[in-house]
């Protein structure tokens, strides 16, 4: 998603761009064998199906949750070996208004305190020492797909050239000037593409971007990143675990307390996170608590959800079919409408099971790493070899969050609205980490920083070791905090595009594709 946005921004500055996509014009459902990796410990769950190749990449499959990192997430946290970001909070969020407009998000605040237009009559606690409540925004289905958003602006743009089914397989580097001269791409069917440019941007997701950087180093005989101790290291992901079941005691107040809020079509949801003070006291990383429910268990809500999806997809035949076979319960439908129109919340029926989960930031560790393995993919390229596993500090973060949340829930009197039945693995002596899985938010292996030995890119996403290469994505995160990464990725894309555009002085002359090159599928 970041690469398409950078391309759009550069064309707006009169710069010619070539977009090279490893996947097809649209991501194909199911697993892509090019995403397969070698996993030394067998711990990582989502390397194949948790990411998508194709125009728009993983933006075609993500849920749409957008929330900033907290100011504390960007600071040095020596108790978990997390370095400071090379950007202050205000610097990082300079492009926030533009990114929110791109996804058609409202301009309301994310910070603690329910937005004033919600008339719920029930408020989550504020000012607690252990937990703060922020408010995430959700992109609608049609506005979460980056290719859907930008296709009209890029597909026929005179300065944009787009190639699909073109996987980078070789780099040509001038080792003396440390400049990238060209890339060579293959599609596995005998077609090849060579691109020369003044500046290159790598925005292929954490796993693939890191693999390509390691391949670039190999093409440079191991000399390009020889002085860098960070490339491929500090692989991390959010870890998510079920911790309890909610027992609703006051249904009316429950859905007005925890249900998603709406303003028009804009969805907001509470993001309950461990405070910086609690983290320092316990010497643990960030974490947040969230509720999940399968609303399709309720016939009325399941029908409404399917109808809404058909409508957003402009699938009017499917919409008609759903209407013909639907059976909407008048009472549930009436409460749903009343909740949305008056309280601006989603009606949460009593026949749906609600689960409590904790999602933690994994502490960065040098030994968790990506390297090029001996196994090859169908294009003959080395697969990612991952050495990664959770650590003791991750278990402590889970346990600290669970223990403090239990006390918080009772201290604030929320157990009178709904109780919590804690699962067995949350008890003393058990392991929460063993019940957890990665959250498909990989990051950290090309981290930002000011020291070229300890980081791969600087605060403008420019590679310390290759003069004309930018890397954009969660791979550049020094730490992941307790926020979904998509908003931060897009803010970094905004920053990188601005820096590149400022540095480029010769418009419409920066990309050269040799005439002899052949593309597999030119969009």
Regions found by a protein language model. Give the residues of each.
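N-terminal Rossmann-like FAD-binding beta1-loop-alpha1 element of flavoenzymes
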Residues: 1-19
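Redox-cofactor-proximal catalytic regions of oxidoreductases
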Residues: 36-112, 363-374, 378
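A glycine-rich dinucleotide-binding beta-alpha-beta segment and adjacent secondary-structure elements
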Residues: 163-176, 339-369, 379, 383-478, ...
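FAD cofactor-binding and catalytic pocket of flavoenzymes
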Residues: 103, 228-231, 240, 244-382, ...
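Conserved redox-cofactor binding core of oxidoreductases
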Residues: 78-180, 426, 430-438
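Glycine-rich loop(s) and the adjacent beta-strand/alpha-helix scaffold that form part
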Residues: 12, 25-26, 48, 171, ...
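Short, solvent-exposed loop/turn and secondary-structure capping segments
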Residues: 28-31, 58, 64, 73-77, ...
């Amino acid at each position: 998603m970041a690469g398409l946005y950078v391309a759009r921004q550069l064309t707006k500055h009169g710069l010619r761009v070539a977009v090279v996509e490893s996947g097809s014009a649209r991501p194909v459902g199911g697993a892509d064998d090019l995403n397969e990796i070698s996993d030394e410990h067998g711990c990582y769950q989502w390397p194949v199906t948790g990411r998508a190749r194709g125009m728009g990449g993983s933006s075609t499959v993500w849920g749409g949750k957008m929330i900033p990192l907290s100011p504390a997430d960007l600071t040095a946290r020596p108790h978990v070996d997390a370095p400071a970001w090379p950007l202050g909070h205000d610097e990082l969020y300079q492009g926030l208004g533009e990114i929110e407009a791109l996804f058609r998000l409202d301009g309301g605040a994310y910070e603690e305190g329910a937005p004033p237009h919600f008339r719920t009559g029930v408020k989550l606690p504020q000012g607690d020492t252990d937990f703060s409540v922020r408010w995430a925004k959700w992109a609608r289905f049609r506005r979460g797909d980056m290719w859907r958003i930008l296709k009209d602006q890029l597909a026929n743009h005179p300065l944009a050239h787009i190639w699909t089914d073109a996987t980078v397989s070789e780099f040509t580097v001038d080792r003396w000037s440390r400049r990238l001269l060209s890339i060579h791409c293959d599609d596995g069917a005998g077609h090849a593409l060579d691109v020369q440019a003044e500046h290159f941007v790598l925005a292929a997701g954490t796993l693939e971007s890191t693999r390509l950087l390691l391949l670039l180093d190999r093409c440079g005989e191991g000399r390009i990143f020889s002085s860098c101790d960070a490339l491929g290291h500090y692989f991390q992901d959010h870890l998510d675990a079920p911790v309890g079941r909610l027992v609703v005691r006051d249904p009316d107040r429950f859905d007005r307390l925890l249900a998603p809020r709406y303003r028009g079509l804009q969805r907001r949801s509470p993001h309950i996170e461990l405070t910086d003070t609690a983290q320092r006291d316990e010497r643990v990383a960030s974490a947040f608590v969230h509720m999940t429910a399968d609303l399709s268990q309720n016939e009325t809500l399941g029908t409404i959800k399917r109808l809404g999806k058909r409508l957003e997809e402009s699938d009017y035949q499917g919409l008609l079919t759903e209407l013909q076979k639907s059976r909407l319960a008048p009472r549930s439908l009436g409460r749903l409408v009343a909740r949305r129109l008056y309280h601006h919340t989603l009606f949460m029926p009593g026949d749906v099971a609600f689960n409590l989960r904790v999602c933690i930031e994994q502490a960065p560790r040098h030994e968790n790493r990506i390297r090029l393995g001996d196994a090859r993919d169908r294009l003959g390229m080395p697969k990612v070899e991952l050495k990664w596993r959770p650590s003791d500090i991750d278990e402590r973060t889970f346990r600290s969050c669970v223990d403090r949340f239990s006390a918080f829930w009772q201290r604030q009197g929320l157990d009178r609205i709904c109780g919590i039945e804690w699962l067995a693995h949350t008890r003393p002596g058990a392991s929460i980490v063993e019940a957890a899985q990665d959250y498909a938010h990989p990051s950290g292996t090309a981290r930002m920083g000011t020291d070229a030995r300890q980081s791969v890119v600087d605060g403008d996403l420019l590679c310390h070791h290759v003069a004309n290469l930018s890397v954009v994505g969660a791979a550049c995160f020094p730490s992941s905090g307790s926020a979904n990464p998509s908003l931060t990725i897009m803010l970094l894309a905004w920053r990188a595009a601005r820096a590149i555009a400022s540095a480029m002085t010769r418009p419409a002359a920066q990309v050269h594709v040799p005439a002899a090159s052949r593309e597999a599928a030119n969009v």
